[in-house]
Amino acid sequence: MILTTVDRRRFLTGSLATAAATLAAPAVLRAQDRTLRILTWEGYAEPEWLDKFKSDTGATVNVVYAGSADEMFAKMQGSQGADFDLVSFDTSLFPRYVDAKLLQPIDPAKLPNLKNLAPEFATVKAVMQGEERYGLPFAWGSLPLVYDTEAFPTPPESWEVMWDEKFAQQMLWQDDANNSITLGALIVGAANPYKLTDDDFAKVKEKLTGQKKFLLSYYAGFDDGVNLFAQNGIKLMYSMGEPQVPALVKKGVKAALTIPKEKAVGWLDCWELSAGAKDKELALAWMNACLDGAVGKALTEKHNYGNTTNVDVNKAAGLTYGDKLSWLETAENYEKRVALWNEIKAG
């Protein structure tokens, strides 16, 4: 979900920094001068929890912000992880990093706050390699069904509503190959939407090709989807993320979102321990600090991300559906998905 990931963060935080941002150290360091080096997305090392961490540890924290998943991987690969202690990326990228030997396992015994993880995030298979944990779930969101509440007084229960000819030319679908094929796989009931068989691919192609005549358009990017929805009397949209709803409301649309019974695609960003970490103890201390419920509260209230520890704050924000999402994993053949998606759009 590389392109959508970039668009999502740009929409939430404005233009992303592509250069290193070094955060000021305390005026007086403690006896042991220590530095934590983090490679992450904007919004994941905020003053609300960063300042407390620096105060508690006396450490300097250097943060580098990545502008895309590819840039993040290149920065890690360039030094075999030696330039960073911590990195953060979503669940679909674990095999890539593990295969490149850029990560090391996390010792759960060093994370007393691990108990704070909400149940749906405590057992995410994608962060495990055998019995070893390689990721700590931190922030999440979804690609939900967005609808006009004037057309739907009650939320649609199934994605099949986007094949209802009654709403022909009043529906939008995101132009993203991997996300589209994955959702199509969920809708047709594939056993694993990220490891499709030839039969699964055939069913997805038939399903999505049959839908094309009902769509007003495919759209690319958060703003494109919001503008097309608001300007054309759209009733239903395969959304690029939760923030499209408040953006539509600002334009006068009575919009809401739902997660249909077939589930929806979910992204789950995690903290990972670099294979080249110089201060492993300090890196684990950061992870443990990020498991504090106060951090989850700030993450959700400031940036509208779902958090993995503070259930009450998620509930207040309406983010109560983590257990109804299919967390992104590495696809069986990304190039095949792109080719199929192009066939569907051309068909």
Predicted regions and their residues:
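N-terminal secretory signal peptides and thylakoid transit peptides that target proteins
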Residues: 2-19
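A bilobed periplasmic-binding-protein/Venus flytrap-type ligand-binding module shared by bacterial periplasmic
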Residues: 145-151, 186-189, 268-279, 298-299
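Early extracytoplasmic/lumenal segment of secretory-pathway proteins
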Residues: 32-96
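Extracellular/periplasmic juxtamembrane helices and adjacent flexible linkers that interface
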Residues: 293-347
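Periplasmic-binding protein-like
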Residues: 49, 167-182, 201-211, 219, 249-275, 289-313
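Extracytoplasmic ligand-binding site segments that recognize negatively charged/polar headgroups
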Residues: 69, 88-216, 221-224
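A ligand-binding cleft/hinge motif common to bilobed small-molecule-binding domains
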Residues: 93-96, 235-254
